[in-house]
Design a protein with these regions (language model features):
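Nucleotidyltransferase catalytic core that binds NTPs
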Residues: 2-169
Length: 169
């Protein structure tokens, strides 16, 4: 698809004036464990909202595992962060992301990638999700200043008694 300008000077995808960048791509799904939700996640949400009319932040959990934070606390924390953003919905789910995406009727799955290893893994997952549901995945590269930040690093720092507040929104 090509990007070109419409009569209003706004970029459009493929010449379709209904797909203005800055919203218009329908409903996106940002899945993750968000254990905890970091500044990196918040940056991906901000950038995804430039593309989608609505974004569902899907907090995934495995019933067989206990997370660092209970899933209910993760959902409540993220809801509180976005309480003034009506385009953000927060839900928890278990099972395959592709199945949850299909259930919600999303336009695309959004994933942040920090490294080439993340990219390769996410490309494989995107292919599987597309084959299962026909739903595409949009990969957003991490902002350079946040590329080294991950939930697992934050958990490890907290485990050793470090203040992690500067990594959290």
């Amino acid at each position: 698809m090509s990007l070109k300008d419409n009569k209003k000077g706004q970029s459009v995808v493929g010449g379709n004036d209904s797909l203005l960048l800055g919203g218009g791509l329908g409903r996106g799904l940002l899945p993750g464990s968000f254990d905890p939700f970091t500044l990196g996640h918040a940056d991906i949400v901000k950038r995804a909202l430039e593309l989608f009319d609505e974004l569902v932040i899907a907090v995934g959990y495995n019933e067989q595992k206990s997370g660092w934070m209970p899933v209910e606390e993760r959902v409540a924390t993220i809801k509180k962060l976005y309480k003034d953003e009506p385009r953000v919905k927060v839900e928890s789910y278990t099972g395959l992301t592709a199945d949850f995406a299909r259930k919600l009727g999303v336009t695309a799955i959004v994933r942040g990638v920090r490294t080439t290893a993340d990219f390769e893994y996410e490309m494989q997952m995107a292919d599987v999700n597309r084959r299962l549901t026909g739903i595409e995945t949009i990969l957003l590269p991490a902002s350079p200043q946040l590329a080294s930040l991950s939930s697992s690093i934050v958990r490890e720092l907290a485990h050793f008694g470090h203040d992690v507040s500067k990594f959290l929104p």
